A protein has these predicted regions:
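Non-membrane alpha-helical structural segments and their capping/turn regions in soluble enzymes
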Residues: 83-87, 104, 142
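Catalytic and substrate-binding regions of cell-wall glycan-acting enzymes that process beta-1,4-linked
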Residues: 106-162
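Surface-exposed patches in mature extracellular/periplasmic domains of secreted proteins
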Residues: 33-35, 77, 100-109, 161-166
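Second-shell loop/turn segments in exported
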Residues: 6-10, 20-23, 46-55, 73-82, ...
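Export/targeting segments at the very N-terminus of extracytoplasmic proteins
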Residues: 1-46, 83-84, 159, 166
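Substrate-binding/active-site groove segments that recognize
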Residues: 52-72, 88-92, 114
Length: 167
């Protein structure tokens, strides 16, 4: 019989801790936040490619990765390499967190794009104050945010319980 910790270990795997810690420190993003995005985007499968063409652990679109790499003067990269994918994806998360000043909005933007999030914030049907969302209009994005938040809760608990250094 499988125990609850085994089930959680399957639902919320944790790999590439060194790469996550490095990128998180470099771009000042909570590693738990990064791990939750990776879990939700790819389940920590570095080789996954979506039907829309998003690649790797953080499911970056090649055009987005190219833009990010240019901004960073990153040089050559391979989105299937965990180090490159996590560095570029974490840098993108840092941009979204800086722009929106809110983890939920950053997650919405990572999934649905910043243009959609700005439209939602400017629509009283979705946002009463123009700063937070009362309703996430895309079901896919709402489910994505919920999945990331569940993963964050688990990874925060794991970090505190096991006192994982730099994580």
């Amino acid at each position: 019989m499988f125990g609850i910790s085994c089930v959680y270990g399957i639902m919320f795997p944790l790999r590439y801790e060194e790469e996550i810690s490095y990128a998180s420190e470099t771009y000042d993003v909570d590693p738990v936040f990064v791990a939750s995005v990776i879990n939700s985007e790819s389940g920590f499968n570095k080789d996954v490619v979506s039907s829309k063409g998003a690649v790797g652990l953080m499911q970056l679109m090649p055009s987005t990765a190219e833009y990010l790499a240019e901004k960073l003067n990153y040089g050559e990269y391979d989105l299937k390499l965990p180090e490159d994918n996590i560095n570029l994806g974490t840098y993108y998360l840092s941009i979204l967190l800086e722009e929106f000043k809110d983890e939920t909005l950053a997650l919405c933007s990572y999934n649905a794009g910043p243009t959609n999030v700005h439209k939602w914030l400017n629509n009283e049907e979705y946002s009463k104050d123009g700063k937070t969302l009362d309703v996430i209009p895309f079901n896919e994005t709402k489910n994505y945010v919920d999945k990331c938040q569940k993963a964050m809760k688990y990874y925060k608990h794991k970090r505190n319980y096991f006192a994982i250094e730099n994580f």
